[in-house]
């Protein structure tokens, strides 16, 4: 079944656009340059509006997911990284359910990656059509078939650019991956904007600045009651406040602290006597992968629910999946789930919301913890990081675990790696829930992604620096 599936995909993989692997070792300075170019292209696409749209001022159905999916409404980056992570989610679920199996051979791995890219392109086309036909840019009947086709083509080409930019970095030309880079940039931009935004918003209390820090100084300067001004700056509703900012900094610190948790397994060289080392198994063994896949699952559920609600709003099954309400308090118009499954899988808006609807909070916590643990556990099987894969890597490096023979290494690693993957995913989910309940800026999922990605880039810099010798030699 598995080989047949991969062989069916093979003819399509040949015609897919592909970035060739570098024929030489790419220097660190070149990697930094290519990473900067990739980021520049992404940011430019985030600012180029789609040609032909009649309106994008209606309530945004994906407002709550845009920070995580690195998308920007009404621009070429409307879809963001959603097609990539959705295709990864589908392939992982198929592999995890043993519907397809990926062998250890480079050929099977390459075919698996090709299948993921193919699904990514198909999903890009599908999401583009859904976005246009559900009226996100105006009534399709008023725009006409030509304009609808033009918008769909723009979204597809932009999605293809994102796929290739991600592959460019993954193949070794840049640092990290395009997905991680785009997510971290989007989240950090959101946090800085919510802290220092000079945009004014007309509230029931008068004109206020959106940025939490700027609002603090503005309230202190304009209000005669300074104590009340401080209270508003720390606890104001529907706009970023200082407690949100403090919660964000706190979650950053907690995640960085947990990044250092690991178990070091002693290993030794099978060839050279007396050469010892350690193999680290981190608490966050699968890093941010569980939260990315969980976000992809929820975002696609939102897309389906929104699409069905727009067409069959009175249907009972559609209402059970999700009912939506438009709101514009404290920012742009956006749609938010107020009932059905989508409501219970979305984070509570604040700690007060937790007290008002504890069932919602409990269901959300169970879903986050369970899904993150599941995705983390299954990811190691398809990503080459399972106990069997690690034992094979150590064997190729002629390393063995101290006190164990080569044949027993897999059994010993199985005691640690699956547990670390599941428990690490559980911790990622718990930290995300904590950040949501504390009201951290950018959502709990967004903060988790930003911290883990920034920490990954920090580790890359440290590794490169140790190889070169100094930061100056590294960059100049």
From Swiss-Prot:
Swiss-Prot/TrEMBL GO biological process terms: cotranslational protein targeting to membrane; endoplasmic reticulum organization; post-translational protein targeting to endoplasmic reticulum membrane; post-translational protein targeting to membrane, translocation; pronephric nephron development; protein insertion into ER membrane; protein targeting to ER; response to type II interferon
Disulfide links within the chain: none
Pfam families attached to this UniProt entry: Plug_translocon, SecY
Lumenal side: 54-76, 139-144, 194-240, 310-354, 442-445
InterPro entries: SecY/SEC61-alpha, SecY_CS, SecY_dom_sf, Translocon_Sec61/SecY_plug_dom
Segments on the Cytoplasmic face: 1-33, 97-117, 166-172, 262-288, 376-420, 463-476
Topology in the lipid bilayer: Multi-pass membrane protein
Effect ascribed to mutating residue 185 to A: In ADTKD5; likely pathogenic; decreases in protein stability; partly confers novel Golgi subcellular location
Tissue note: Expressed in proximal and distal tubules in kidney (at protein level).
Annotated transmembrane regions: 34-53, 77-96, 118-138, 145-165, 173-193, 241-261, 289-309, 355-375, 421-441, 446-462
Cellular localization per UniProt: Endoplasmic reticulum membrane
Effect of residue 344 to H: Reduces cotranslational translocation of APLN precursor/preproapelin
Complexes and interactors: The SEC61 channel-forming translocon complex consists of channel-forming core components SEC61A1, SEC61B and SEC61G and different auxiliary components such as SEC62 and SEC63. The SEC61 channel associates with the multi-pass translocon (MPT) complex.
Disease linked to the protein: Tubulointerstitial kidney disease, autosomal dominant 5: A form of autosomal dominant tubulointerstitial kidney disease, a genetically heterogeneous disorder characterized by slowly progressive loss of kidney function, bland urinary sediment, hyperuricemia, absent or mildly increased albuminuria, lack of severe hypertension during the early stages, and normal or small kidneys on ultrasound. Immunodeficiency, common variable, 15: An autosomal dominant immunologic disorder resulting in recurrent severe infections since early childhood or infancy, and characterized by hypogammaglobulinemia with antibody deficiencies of IgM, IgG, and IgA due to impaired plasma cell homeostasis, although other B cell subset numbers are normal. T and NK cells are also normal. CVID15 inheritance is autosomal dominant.
Role noted for this protein: Component of SEC61 channel-forming translocon complex that mediates transport of signal peptide-containing precursor polypeptides across the endoplasmic reticulum (ER). Forms a ribosome receptor and a gated pore in the ER membrane, both functions required for cotranslational translocation of nascent polypeptides. May cooperate with auxiliary protein SEC62, SEC63 and HSPA5/BiP to enable post-translational transport of small presecretory proteins.
Family assignment from sequence similarity: Belongs to the SecY/SEC61-alpha family.
Name of the protein described by the UniProt record: Protein transport protein Sec61 subunit alpha isoform 1
Organism this protein belongs to: Homo sapiens (Human)
Gene: SEC61A1
